[in-house]
Design a protein with these regions (language model features):
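Conserved ABC ATPase signature
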Residues: 137, 161-165, 169
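Catalytic Walker B motif of ABC-type/P-loop ATPase nucleotide-binding domains
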Residues: 186-190
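Pre-NBD coupling/linker segments of ABC/ABC-like ATPases
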Residues: 1-31, 102, 133-139
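Hydrophobic anchor residue at the start of the ABC signature
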Residues: 175-176
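Conserved structural motif at the start of ABC-family nucleotide-binding domains
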Residues: 25, 40-42
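Helix-to-loop junction immediately C-terminal to a conserved catalytic motif
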Residues: 71-72
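Conserved ABC ATPase "signature" region
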Residues: 124, 139-157
Length: 227
């Protein structure tokens, strides 16, 4: 049952976050322009540890741009006044030091992942933030991947090549990938996109349970108020 599912997530051990800042994201007068289009204009935004944010707005309103800044994926982020986990960008931290705290999924990512690896290896790539695996996962890491695949109802697909999964199953695998390192900051860009009614309910329950845990921070982009 979904109640049992939620309990399993809420009961996960709390490993303590390894960054010591109350501010997870801080943008100070951030502007992003592409050519003569201004996507973000002098935006101030602070996300504190444990907060849950929903971003909604039209396509092209800058939501994905905002997420790419937070994920440290945007090439313009170095020029902007942005701090992540209490550390200002461009003060010597590597992108991997930032990413180790972040779990992320988006529809764009789905298009980038056309790799014919077994589904569990796609999930495992979330442990190291690589699209292809650089390191073979250890057995205990594989067990964690299987645990999250089970949470999303796809444990029986772990050895199936990713490209042979249905589109909805691929989405669930990429969601499992976002959760697999039990991140401090979870960034979900339209997490229910492309799912059927049953799996939308399931994923909502997983997200709700994750959000009940101590100090977990979430930013979710949605097109729909109802989500």
């Amino acid at each position: 049952s979904f109640d049992e599912l939620q309990k399993r997530i809420i009961d996960l051990p709390y490993d303590g976050n390894n960054y010591d800042s109350d501010e997870v994201v801080k943008l100070n007068k951030v502007s992003i322009r592409y050519g003569d289009r201004t996507i973000l204009n002098e935006l101030d935004w602070t996300v504190h540890r444990g907060e849950k944010w929903a971003l909604s707005g039209e396509n092209g309103a800058g939501k994905s741009t905002l997420l790419s800044l937070v994920c440290a994926d945007n090439p313009q982020s170095y020029a902007c006044d942005i701090s992540l986990f209490g550390r200002k960008r461009g003060t010597g931290e590597s992108i991997w030091e930032i990413k180790k705290h972040i779990g992320y999924v988006s529809p764009e990512m789905h298009r980038a992942y056309l790799k014919n690896l077994p589904a569990i290896e796609i999930v495992a790539s979330g442990l190291h933030d690589s699209i292809g695996l650089y390191k073979r996962p250890q057995p205990e890491q594989m067990a964690v991947c299987e645990w999250w695949m089970d949470i999303f109802g796809i444990a029986d697909l772990k050895d199936k090549p990713f490209l042979q999964l249905s589109s909805g199953e691929q989405r669930l695998a990429l969601l499992a990938r976002a959760f697999v390192k039990d991140p401090e900051l979870l960034i979900l860009d339209e997490p229910l996109h492309g799912l059927d009614t049953y799996n939308r309910r399931r994923v909502k329950k997983v997200i709700e349970a994750f959000c009940k845990r101590k100090d977990k921070t979430m930013i979710m982009v949605t097109h729909y108020e109802s989500e």
